[in-house]
Amino acid sequence: MDISKKTNLTMLCDYYELTMGNGYFVQGMQDCITYFDIFFRSVPDNGGFAIAAGLEQAIEYISQLHFDEADIEYLRGRKMFDEGFLDYLRNFRFTGDIWAVPEGTPIMTVRAPAIQAQLVETFLLLTLNHQSLIATKANRVTRAAKGRTVLEFGSRRAQGVDAAVDGARAAYIGGCKGTACTLTDQLYGVPAGGTMAHSWVQMFPSEYDAFKAYCETYPDNPTLLVDTYNTLKSGIPNAIRVFNEVLKPRGLTKCGIRLDSGDMTYLTKKARKMLDAAGWQSCKISCSNSLDEYIIEDILNQGAQIDLFGVGERLITAKSEAVFGGVYKLIAIEDAEGN
C-alpha cells in the first residue's frame, strides 16, 4: 500500500514533537544524533509473550515523510515556529537508522538527528502498539484452537477503517489463516473468504431454496449458515438435503455448515452426528459469534465438534486487553566523535 497516495501522514504526530523540534533547531541541536528505543512494559492478558507487528507500515510511513506547503502554512499560522525551522521542514527527509525484530516474532531502535527522531514517535507507537496488540491476541486465539483453522471476522466491529484493514493483517501475522476483509486481501495478500449472512437465507421463499441457490452458484466447497430459523430441526436437515441434491450428483464432497448462535458445544455435537449419519463426514463445521481464546478453550474442553472458528469483535478490538502499552524513550545521545 502506497501511503503517499492515500494521504500525507507526516502531520500525524503529537504537537509537542513539533514544538520540541523547533526548540532543538533554535538551540542548534538539530544535528545531534539520538537513540530511541520502543519497548513495552507488560504483555497483554498476562499471557507470557507478545508478537511484534506493524513494521511494514512503519517503514512505509518513514520512507514517505515530507512536509508540503499546506503543512508549512498551517505551522506558520500557529505563530510558534521559527522561519528557519519551517525551511528545515520544507526540505525534511528521514536520514536515520532503524533496527527492529522481524514481524511475527516475540521491537525497534531509532538512531537519527533529534528532530527526526521526535517527529516519528507518534506514528511508530500507534502503528506498532495497535498491530502488535492484535497479532498477540490472534496468536492466543489460534493456540486455543489447537490446530483448527481460525479466520479473522472483525471488520464491522473494528474501531475505524485502518483498525479493520491493518488489524486483519496483524491477525494474519499472529496466526489466523485468513480474513473476511476484502481490502486487506487486495492490499496485503491476506486470503479473504466468506459465505453468507442470515439476510441471504431471508431473501428466499424458504431456507431450502436459499441453500439450493447458494450451492448451485458456488458448488465448490460451499458453507451454509444453518441457524437462521432452527439449527437442528430445519437448518442442518435442509443443508443435508441440498448437499445430496446438488453436490452428490456432481461427485463433490467438500462442504461446510456454520453456526452463529446458540450453545456451540451441544449444537455441534448434534450436528456432527446428523452429518455423519447422512454420509457427510467430509462436511466441516464452523462457528462464530463473539468468540475469543477463553470461550474456544472452554467449548473444546467440553467436546465441541468444530473444525473452523470465525473470530470477530474480541479479536479485532483485543477486547480483554485493549492497550499494548509500547513506549518510545531516549536511551543515548552521540557525541561529536560518534561515541
What are these regions (language model features)?
Residues 195, 199-339:
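Glycine-rich phosphate/ribose-binding loops and adjacent secondary-structure elements
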Residues 1-220, 246-248, 329-339:
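Ordered alpha/beta subdomains of enzyme catalytic regions
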